Swiss-Prot record:
It is a peripheral membrane protein. One of its GO terms (cellular component) is plasma membrane. InterPro entries: AAA+_ATPase, ATP-synt_VA_C, ATP_synth_F1_bsu, ATPase_a/bsu_AS, ATPase_alpha/beta_chains, ATPase_F1/V1/A1_a/bsu_N, ATPase_F1/V1/A1_a/bsu_N_sf, ATPase_F1/V1/A1_a/bsu_nucl-bd. It comes from Nitrosomonas eutropha (strain DSM 101675 / C91 / Nm57). Belongs to the ATPase alpha/beta chains family. PROSITE patterns: ATPASE_ALPHA_BETA. It comes from the Bacteria. Its EC number is 7.1.2.2. This is ATP synthase subunit beta 2. Its main location: membrane. Residues 1-10 have a biased composition (Basic and acidic residues). One of its GO terms (molecular function) is ATP hydrolysis activity. Produces ATP from ADP in the presence of a proton gradient across the membrane. The catalytic sites are hosted primarily by the beta subunits.
Amino acid sequence: MSGMGEKSEQISKSARSTDPQEQESVALASQCVGEGRVLKIRGGVVDVFFTEHIPRIHDLVYAGDLAMEVAALLDQGTVRCIALTPVRGLGLGMPVHATGAPIQVPVGEAVLGRMLNVFGEPIDGKPAPNATISRSIHQAPPVLEERVVHSTILETGIKAIDLLSPIERGGKTGLFGGAGVGKTVLITELINNTAQHHKGVSLFCGIGERSREAEELYREMGEAGVRDKTVMLFGQMSEAPGVRFLVGKTALTMAEYFRDDLGQDVLLLIDNVFRFVQAGSEVSGLLGRMPSRVGYQPTLATELASLQERITSTRKGAITSIQAVYVPADDFTDPAAAHIFSHLSASVVLSRKRASEGLYPAVDPLASTSVMLTPAVVGQRHYDIARAVRRTLAEYEELRDIIAMLGLEELSAADRTVVARARRLERFLTQPFFSAESFSGEIGARVSVAETLAGCERILQQTKFADDEIDYYMIGALPEQKTAV
Ligand SMILES: Nc1ncnc2c1ncn2[C@@H]1O[C@H](COP(=O)(O)OP(=O)(O)OP(=O)(O)O)[C@@H](O)[C@H]1O
C-alpha cells in the first residue's frame, strides 16, 4: 500500500509541474490513486471519506460519471467536493475515485477551431481534440519580472472606443453595462473587427450566459472566417456553479500555452466576467462560508485576482483581453464591478440612457476611460480631439437642464453652438454594427482612427450648421459633402 502512496504522491507532483512530458504521464498514471465513499450530499456539495491517499485541494474526483473538484479538506479523511455535473443518481456510500490531479485540459494547435467545455471536451459534436499535451487548469500567474507593458493600441474600427477609450494591445479592457445595454452585441462586433486582423489566435470564453448566444457566435465565427484560429469555451448558465467558476481558468490555460510555449499573441474575449464572480459566490455559499459585503463571498478579491493576474503579457507573447462585465442594477459601486474595474487598463462604460435614446453603441463618453489616452501613446492630435469631444459633451450635459426649463432659444449664441456640436458628435459616435445587421437592418461599418478623428475635428470646428443632426446618425466615416459651411 505504501507503493500506492508513493505513486499518488508522484502523480500529484507531476500534475502540478509545468513540464509537458511529465504532464502527459499524469493522465495514464492517474487511474488508480485513491478510493473513497460518499458520506453526505447537499445540493452540489458532496462530502467524501477516504481512508488513504486523501486527495488535495483542486484535485478531480469521480463518483461514477459525476465529476467533482475537491474544494475543502474537512478533517482527517473527509474532503468536501463541488459537483461539476448534475448529482442525479448519486447515493450515500457510493464509491468515489480520486484521479490524483486537478482538471487537465488539452492545449496547443489541436484545440483551434473547436468548441469545448470546462474539461476541454468537445461540445461541437466532433471527436475529442487530438492533443499530445494537457495541462492543469490551476496555474500560478507569471512572476513580476516576466511581465511587460506595451504601449500600443489595438484598433477596433469602432469610433467611440478608438477615440475615447483606446484598447491597449496586451492589456485588459472591460465593457461595463447593466442588463440589455448591448454588451454581447459589442463583444461580437469586436470579434468581427479584431479577430480577422489579429495575427495570433483568439479565444472566446462564455461564462454563465445563454446557450443560444453560444450557438449564434459559433455560426458568426464561421461566417467571418475566423473559426479555424479561434477556440471557444463555454460554461453556460444552465451548468453547475463549479463549471462556471472554472471555465475561465480552462480558457486561460489554453491561452497561456499559446503565449508561453508557442510565442503567439492571444486575443481573449470573456462574456461575462461578472458571472465568474457570481459562480464563486454560489460555490462559497455551498461551502457554507459566511457572506461578506453586499452578500458576496469573502474571497472575492483573491478569486478575481487568481484569474485576472494570469491575463498578462510576458516577454514571450501578449494576451489582450476584452471582458464584458454585467453591472447589477446599473450600480457601478457594486463590489464585483468595482473590483473588476481595478484590474483593467481601459473601461468602456455602456449607459442605459444612451441605449434608450437609440444611440448605439451606448458608450458613455464621459465615464469611459483608458490609460492609453495620453499624448505619448495616441499622439497630441488624438488626445486634443478626445479632450475637446469630452468637454463639448460635458458642457451640453450641464446645459440640458436649462434647455429643459427655458428652451434652446434662451441660450447664448456660444452655448447654442456647443449644443449643436454636441448633438452632432453624439450622433456621429453611433455606428452601424456588422453584428447588429440582422435586427437593425443597417449595413455594418468599420471606421479607421484617422477617419474618426477627421470627423470629430470637422464637427468641433464648425460654427454654423446647415445640415440635419440625423445625417450624422448611424453612419461610418463623415462623407466629404459634410464639410463646414
Ligand atoms: N449596436 C447596436 N445596434 C442596434 N441595436 C443594439 C446594438 N446593441 C444592442 N442593441 C439592442 O440591445 C439589445 C440587447 O443587447 P445585448 O444582448 O448585447 O445586451 P447585453 O448587455 O449583453 O444584455 P444581457 O446583460 O442581458 O446579456 C439587442 O438585442 C438589440 O436590440
